[in-house]
């Protein structure tokens, strides 16, 4: 059997960002509206700083208004919620995102609950989760929404496909399953405690791995010809001893890529697969939120 098609998330994301920029230009020209995204960063987690910087740069590149609000690691819950309230009320801001993780003394659940559902571009509030589950228009979590863009291009019509999602988080696993269900897939949600997980995975025409365990999904778990979407991301020392000694690292997904590509029909690499789609979908969600908040048809 020939090797799997490698799904180029960077190329898809670049096209999506171009589409978003074109939509933004139309909103500015026809409605005098500039979509605005505010990102809140608490503390100085290095990975979060990189993510936040990338979000800001890509927001500006799409012609949108970008704000980054930085709070110290010892900021109180009240300070953070006060900032979120101000952003909820700011008519120039259409998307509000708090970069997680936050320091341990802060309640992630309370933070999510404070974000206006109309500006919840991460799709985490119970209102958006409920709307998604009910088949109503919703702001959908960016990573699963990006996965669906990839799947629709690679697979085409998803009707009747057997889909297995490994992972049940509110940010990824649950909304991914809802989106697949809405596309008329037959969906199984599995997780690290599922019995005989390899056998469950072998039934899948579409396998989405989002469990957070490096290379847990082996090649012999995959149905020949299946489409594999690897959402996991773990960091390990470089295989090159010199590079490792210098602190260089490599990124690894939840799927044993070298094994899986010999069996799957198509597969996303890590890095360069799902990751680039996440920020592109964040921009798309912000444009959607701006349109809805201003009564503009999508």
Curated annotation (Swiss-Prot):
The UniProt record lists the keyword Metal-binding: no
Reactions mediated catalytically: (6R)-5,10-methylene-5,6,7,8-tetrahydrofolate + NADP(+) = (6R)-5,10-methenyltetrahydrofolate + NADPH; (6R)-5,10-methenyltetrahydrofolate + H2O = (6R)-10-formyltetrahydrofolate + H(+)
Stored InterPro entries: Aminoacid_DH-like_N_sf (IPR046346), NAD(P)-bd_dom_sf (IPR036291), THF_DH/CycHdrlase (IPR000672), THF_DH/CycHdrlase_cat_dom (IPR020630), THF_DH/CycHdrlase_CS (IPR020867), THF_DH/CycHdrlase_NAD-bd_dom (IPR020631)
Pathway(s) annotated for this protein in UniProt: One-carbon metabolism; tetrahydrofolate interconversion
E.C. numbers: 1.5.1.5, 3.5.4.9
UniProt keyword Hydrolase present: yes
GO molecular function terms attached to this record: methenyltetrahydrofolate cyclohydrolase activity; methylenetetrahydrofolate dehydrogenase (NADP+) activity
GO (cellular component) term, any one: cytosol
Amino-acid positions noted as binding NADP(+) in the UniProt annotation, renumbered to this chain: 167-169, 192, 233
GO biological process, one term: tetrahydrofolate interconversion
Keywords, ordered alphabetically: Amino-acid biosynthesis, Histidine biosynthesis, Hydrolase, Methionine biosynthesis, Multifunctional enzyme, NADP, One-carbon metabolism, Oxidoreductase, Purine biosynthesis
PANTHER family (alphabetical): C-1-TETRAHYDROFOLATE SYNTHASE, CYTOPLASMIC (PTHR48099:SF5), C-1-TETRAHYDROFOLATE SYNTHASE, CYTOPLASMIC-RELATED (PTHR48099)
General function of this protein: Catalyzes the oxidation of 5,10-methylenetetrahydrofolate to 5,10-methenyltetrahydrofolate and then the hydrolysis of 5,10-methenyltetrahydrofolate to 10-formyltetrahydrofolate.
Family: Belongs to the tetrahydrofolate dehydrogenase/cyclohydrolase family.
Quaternary structure and interacting proteins, as annotated: Homodimer.
Official protein name in the record: Bifunctional protein FolD
Species per Swiss-Prot/TrEMBL record: Caulobacter sp. (strain K31)
Gene: folD
